[in-house]
């Protein structure tokens, strides 16, 4: 690794190497030379005749490990760019409520883009469901759709499109790519698919479990339309669903092209080897972080008087952690329930945040973690539990509980402040931002999405152009964060005026119980919902 400012004119840098400078980084691959000409331009030239890079080898090269870290993440980022550019809905196109990732041929997460954490840590189970239910029936050109919360989904509006990637002979699956997008409406009792009083999954919309939308390249359009229009509460705007599904297919196709390009350049053996090295590196980073943690437990009270209970124990010899949720409340009779995939996503996110280096979120992060979750509890709900608030509220509450047990940061707003509104013609979904918790030597941040969500606020001009609504105020709610030596971040005030009748749903938390502080000075005031 070289600093460009340290290089002399005509000094040769033999690849593989990295040359860093204030405004960028240059990677010199094996078989290339880099040098500065008399004008200090960096000139790259081939040092040897081009050979197939399939001979790159399978042992770990630290430079190539970093290259592949970024290659894998970049593929997911390119998928996300395609999805944002081609989607129809404001929810996906503007709010960026989607995630893209690539997986190995067993369904293990390899890499993701920095999209929505609650999506990314839960998608592996969706891939494994497709593999399990379609054994010997997956072919080139197939595309699968799934939103079933109990088979790797989160809640019904989050629809996952999964595409296998085959080798050049079309015989062996080398990877899977997947995109998960929050559709503005997937049916249900209320517009936007967020009924506050749902007790059964059927009341929340259309459930899609392992549907093959493309069969060997043939689009089964009539069949998917039939599914979207089925059930007690069908989708309200199927054309919008179809447009966003098409965008997700396009995103996956981008991933396939990028993966095949990488395989063409480096060879499948090298790509698969570094895929494993990337996961091994993530595992080692998590193990190194674990030895610096302290054991702890936390009882996290919810607004309904129930508790999420968690105990974290550390084995510093094995460098492993056990996360035990024994004692957590049983399944909620309404919709504050999360499937196991969401619980896994939260744990993966929390432990990934403990790593200072820029590693991709992947399956390796799970290997040092032993997870104990009571069966049929509110964080391990089974069919036919209602789960619309699980992906949003329960994930945030569980995340705060884990940070409480670790004692490393104060509680965030711990809610996504889901604000869902619409009618038979239009539907929209928002998560309203808030404040992050303070740390041992820093203040929290005001007016941001926290933890398990990572979406954007819709641009006011686009919001008012696409919907019959006027945004009257969007401001920071000053001094609303918890007070202490280091203060929690402030929340926001958001006022909308509807220009025609709408049904409004809110799914929120911490209206009675305040987020916790560390060292317990002052907690934040409770949020307020709707003024009339």
Task: Name these PLM-found stretches.
Residues 1-524, 528, 532:
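C-terminal, non-catalytic interaction/recognition modules in large multi-subunit enzymes and RNPs
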């Amino acid at each position: 690794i070289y600093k460009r400012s340290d290089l002399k004119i005509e000094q040769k840098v033999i690849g593989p190497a990295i040359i860093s400078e204030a405004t960028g980084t240059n990677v010199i691959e094996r078989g290339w030379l880099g040098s500065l000409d008399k004008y200090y331009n960096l000139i790259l030239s081939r040092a040897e005749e081009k050979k197939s890079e399939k001979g790159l080898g399978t042992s770990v090269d630290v430079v190539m490990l970093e290259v592949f870290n970024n290659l894998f993440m970049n593929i997911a980022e390119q998928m996300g760019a395609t999805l944002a550019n081609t989607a129809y809905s404001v929810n996906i196109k503007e709010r960026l409520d989607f995630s893209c990732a690539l997986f190995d041929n067993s369904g293990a997460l390899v890499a993701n883009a920095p999209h929505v954490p609650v999506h990314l840590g839960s998608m592996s189970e969706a891939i494994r469901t497709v593999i399990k239910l379609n054994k010997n029936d997956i072919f080139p050109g197939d595309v699968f759709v799934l939103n079933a919360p109990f088979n790797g989904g989160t809640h019904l509006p989050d629809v996952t499109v999964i595409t296998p990637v085959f080798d050049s002979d079309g015989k062996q699956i080398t990877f899977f790519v997947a995109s998960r997008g929050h559709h503005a409406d997937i049916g249900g009792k209320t517009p936007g698919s967020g009924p506050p009083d749902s007790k059964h999954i059927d009341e929340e919309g259309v459930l899609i479990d392992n549907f093959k939308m493309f069969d060997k390249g043939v689009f089964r359009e009539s069949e998917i339309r039939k599914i979207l229009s089925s059930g007690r509460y069908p989708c309200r705007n199927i054309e919008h669903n179809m447009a966003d599904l098409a965008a997700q297919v396009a995103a996956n196709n981008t991933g396939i092209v990028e993966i095949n390009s990488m395989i063409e350049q480096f060879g499948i053996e090298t790509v698969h080897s570094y895929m494993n090295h990337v996961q091994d590196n993530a595992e080692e980073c998590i193990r190194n972080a674990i030895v610096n943690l302290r054991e702890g437990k936390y009882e996290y009270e919810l607004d309904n008087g129930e508790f999420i209970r968690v105990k974290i124990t550390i084995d510093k010899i094995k460098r492993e952690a056990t996360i035990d949720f024994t004692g957590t409340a049983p399944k909620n009779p309404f919709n504050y329930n999360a499937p196991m995939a969401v619980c896994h996503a939260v744990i993966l996110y929390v432990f990934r945040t403990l790593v200072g280096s820029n590693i991709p979120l992947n399956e390796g992060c799970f290997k040092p973690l032993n997870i104990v979750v009571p069966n049929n509890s509110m964080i391990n709900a089974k069919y036919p539990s209602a789960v619309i608030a699980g992906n949003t509220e329960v994930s945030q509450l569980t995340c705060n509980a884990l940070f409480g047990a670790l004692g490393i940061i104060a509680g965030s707003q711990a809610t996504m402040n889901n604000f869902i509104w619409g009618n038979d013609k239009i539907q929209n979904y928002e998560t309203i931002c808030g404040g992050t918790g303070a740390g041992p030597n820093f203040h929290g941040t005001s007016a941001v999405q926290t933890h398990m969500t990572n979406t954007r606020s819709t641009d006011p001009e686009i919001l008012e152009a696409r919907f019959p609504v006027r945004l009257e105020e969007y401001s920071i709610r000053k001094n609303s964060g918890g007070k202490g030596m280091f203060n929690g971040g402030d929340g926001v005030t958001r006022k909308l005026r509807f220009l025609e009748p709408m049904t409004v749903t809110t799914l929120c938390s911490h209206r009675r119980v305040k987020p916790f502080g560390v060292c317990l000075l002052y907690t934040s005031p409770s949020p307020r919902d709707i003024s009339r």
